[in-house]
Amino acid sequence: MTKPQLSYFKVRALGQFPRVLLSYLSIDYDNNYIDKIDENIIDDLKYGQLPLYTDSNGFKLVQSMAISKYIASQHDFVGKTPEEKALVDETLAAVNIDVFTFIIRVFRGVEEKEKIQEIIIPRFFAKWNQILGEKKYLAGGNSYTLADLYVYVAYEYIGYVLPFAADLLYNGKFPHLDSLKEHFESNKGVAEYLKNRPITERKI
Amino acid sequence: MSTSSVPSLTYFQGRGLGQFSRVLLSYLGIPYENITVTEISDALRATLPYGQLPIYRDGDFVLTQSSTIARYIAKKHNFMGKNLEEEFLVDQIVTAIHADIFPAFNNPVPEKLQKLYEKYFGSFEKKLQETGFLVGSSVTLADLYVYVGFDYIRFRGEAALSSELSDEKYPKIAELKKFFESNEGVAKYIKERPETKF
């Protein structure tokens, strides 16, 4: 049986979620860095976009959120009950559709950076910090799930792409998010991935 | 707040992001309370996990994010495909509509939007022509999502470049529209929904 493969550009962005997930779950996979989408890969891309995940059985999937949920579902990392699973999904949608999209729009200069402080931090990061303080895990339940991993990746990513946001978020301002970051980064697989990931040309 | 024993969906009076779940609940014949608001009051905002609508309440369980609400309902009613692979092929389409198509026509750049529609709706049309369904061998949330997304863009008019989505260009998606709108629950919902701008 072949190893699963994740194909994405040599940047963090949307590839970061499944890469960190695969590393955290200690899944041996081929991390394919793509320079550009060419004829060798285009036929596999449903909407002409990366990331692309090819499972060991040959099953192909695009859309980073769908990829992450598919992998997490195979490894019992999406919550235990239908309600927990839905709360995981809710968190992922908030990260992917609201927060991540907004970060990129600010990075590209399409959205004013003040909105990070006015909307994104109070509405999302402060909320997640509060939930973690009350329940320890973002989807409730009694263990980490993909929801926690997604919020960690977003928390780490926003400070990387928008350095001004690091001053607003880090250094003890959101202690439960800091603990979450510590949890994931002390994982052997994630630590190794972070140590080996390339410095990218485009800060994205 | 609703005290009803049936689930409730709260959203603005417009179609917007509430449309997916409203059509889904109607199609599946699930009785629900369709609560519409004109604005998010401070009292309401305090009950919303991220200060946003729609919000779905099923007993004590509260859920936001329209795609999450739709998937939760669909999963409960075996409308997400027959196995794990199918479930995530459905998910792939739902995510594409929410994360790629909807944000694009809210901030339209005509040439980009035209290409985007061709890429996505072209892919959906091709799949429907090949197999009759977007995923697997039966109707799923993916089909309903493509119908609602397609129909909504046309409803939004030229601001959303709606003329790009003609029946002639996408005959199979047009058939999908006919299929869903001939469903008793959906037909009733469409007949009774108010005229709105968005």
Swiss-Prot record, chain A:
Extract the PROSITE patterns matched here.
Answer: GST_CTER (PS50405), GST_NTER (PS50404)
Q: What is its EC number?
A: 2.5.1.18
- List UniProt keywords, sorted A-Z: Acetylation, Transferase
The record's SUPFAM superfamilies line, in alphabetical order, gives:
GST C-terminal domain-like, Thioredoxin-like
**Top-tier EC class:** transferase
Keyword Acetylation in annotation: yes
Catalytic activity from the UniProt record: RX + glutathione = an S-substituted glutathione + a halide anion + H(+)
MF (Gene Ontology): glutathione transferase activity
| One protein family per Pfam | GST_C_3
| Residue numbers of N-acetylthreonine PTMs | 2
Annotated family: Belongs to the GST superfamily. Alpha family.
Q: Any idea what job this protein has?
A: Conjugation of reduced glutathione to a wide number of exogenous and endogenous hydrophobic electrophiles.
Name of the featured protein: Putative glutathione S-transferase alpha-3
From which source organism is this entry? Dictyostelium discoideum (Social amoeba)
Taxonomic lineage of the native organism: Eukaryota, Amoebozoa, Evosea, Eumycetozoa, Dictyostelia
UniProtKB/Swiss-Prot annotation, chain B:
Family matches, as InterPro entries:
Glutathione-S-Trfase_C-like, Glutathione-S-Trfase_C_sf, Glutathione_S-Trfase, Glutathione_S-Trfase_N, GST_C, GST_superfamily, Thioredoxin-like_sf
Q: Which UniProt keywords apply?
A: Acetylation, Transferase
Cite the GO molecular-function annotations of the record: glutathione transferase activity
An annotated GO cellular component? phagocytic vesicle
Q: What is its EC number?
A: 2.5.1.18
Which Gene Ontology BP terms does the record give? glutathione metabolic process; response to curcumin; slug development involved in sorocarp development
Q: Which residues carry this modification: N-acetylserine?
A: 2
| Record: residues binding glutathione | 11, 45, 52-53, 65-66
Recorded hits in SUPFAM superfamilies, A to Z, give: GST C-terminal domain-like, Thioredoxin-like
Keyword Acetylation included in the entry's annotation: yes
Tell whether Transferase is among the UniProt keywords.
Answer: yes
Q: Which family does it belong to?
A: Belongs to the GST superfamily. Alpha family.
> What does this protein do, in the record's words?
Conjugation of reduced glutathione to a wide number of exogenous and endogenous hydrophobic electrophiles.
State what protein this is by name: Putative glutathione S-transferase alpha-2
Query: What organism, scientifically named, is this protein from?
Result: Dictyostelium discoideum
The coding gene here is gsta2-1
